[in-house]
Amino acid sequence: MPTRSTNPNKQPVELNRTSLFLGLLLVFVLGILFSSYFFN
């Protein structure tokens, strides 16, 4: 991470974007698992 010392304001934005993406991916996977579980 070479841009951490030069751009301290860019790191939290990327972390929030990554956490948001992981959260949406987790909800998407859980939705698929629950839908397949209920349809079976």
Swiss-Prot record:
Q: Where in the cell is it found?
A: Cellular thylakoid membrane
The protein's matches in SUPFAM superfamilies, at most eight in alphabetical order, are given as: Photosystem II reaction center protein L, PsbL
Under the heading Pfam families, the entry gives:
PsbL (PF02419)
Q: Which HAMAP family match?
A: PSII_PsbL (MF_01317)
Membrane topology term reads: Single-pass membrane protein
Species lineage: Bacteria, Bacillati, Cyanobacteriota, Cyanophyceae, Synechococcales
Please give the family membership noted in the entry: Belongs to the PsbL family.
Q: So what does this one do?
A: One of the components of the core complex of photosystem II (PSII). PSII is a light-driven water:plastoquinone oxidoreductase that uses light energy to abstract electrons from H(2)O, generating O(2) and a proton gradient subsequently used for ATP formation. It consists of a core antenna complex that captures photons, and an electron transfer chain that converts photonic excitation into a charge separation. This subunit is found at the monomer-monomer interface and is required for correct PSII assembly and/or dimerization.
Look up keyword Coiled coil and say if it applies.
no
Name the residues that span the membrane: 19-39
Subunit and partners: PSII is composed of 1 copy each of membrane proteins PsbA, PsbB, PsbC, PsbD, PsbE, PsbF, PsbH, PsbI, PsbJ, PsbK, PsbL, PsbM, PsbT, PsbX, PsbY, PsbZ, Psb30/Ycf12, peripheral proteins PsbO, CyanoQ (PsbQ), PsbU, PsbV and a large number of cofactors. It forms dimeric complexes.
Record keyword Ligase present: no
Which named protein is this? Photosystem II reaction center protein L
This protein's GO cellular component annotations are:
photosystem II reaction center; plasma membrane-derived thylakoid membrane
A GO BP term here is: photosynthesis
Keyword set for this entry? Membrane, Photosynthesis, Photosystem II, Reaction center, Thylakoid, Transmembrane, Transmembrane helix
